[in-house]
């Protein structure tokens, strides 16, 4: 009888640990120094299972005027999530030009697309950007975190 109780307690503890561990495995939270990057959509081209959005905006941190192209591909059967690739070009008032490759994942709920991106710049900087695209308002609003 004592062994049965002991086994049930051990099983309960293991189940509790599994529940706690699995909950933390599905959370994604980024913290630390970041800067805002806000853009206005300039075009949206739709295709079969894909879309391309271009946008532009002024970004601090020395980037200046930034032009973005995001190529979205649907990967879920319901059409509500997928991957994207893209390019960025920046030019500041001193005429310094930078470029970056963009890649990440997206999901959509209603008019809002949530994006998680890792961006590699030509100067070696890697940024993580996370934010939201409002398809109705035509805005893109990101928080950018320098990875390295």
Please tell me what each predicted stretch does:
Residues 11-21:
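Bacterial N-terminal signal peptides
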Residues 2-13:
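Bacterial N-terminal signal peptides that target proteins for export
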Residues 24-148:
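Beta-strand-enriched cores of mature, soluble protein domains
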């Amino acid at each position: 009888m004592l062994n049965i109780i002991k086994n049930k307690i051990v099983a309960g503890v293991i189940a509790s640990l599994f529940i706690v561990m699995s909950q933390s495995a599905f959370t994604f939270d980024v913290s630390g120094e970041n800067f805002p990057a806000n853009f206005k959509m300039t075009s949206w081209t739709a295709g079969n299972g894909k879309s391309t959005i271009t946008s532009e905006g002024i970004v601090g941190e020395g980037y200046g005027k930034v032009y973005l192209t995001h190529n979205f591909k649907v990967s879920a059967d319901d059409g509500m999530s997928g991957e994207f690739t893209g390019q960025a070009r920046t030019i500041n008032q001193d005429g310094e030009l930078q470029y970056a490759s963009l890649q990440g994942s997206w999901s959509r709920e209603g008019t809002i697309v949530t994006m998680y991106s890792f961006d590699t710049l030509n100067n070696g900087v890697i940024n993580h950007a996370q934010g939201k695209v409002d398809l109705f308002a035509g805005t893109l609003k990101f928080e950018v975190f320098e990875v390295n």
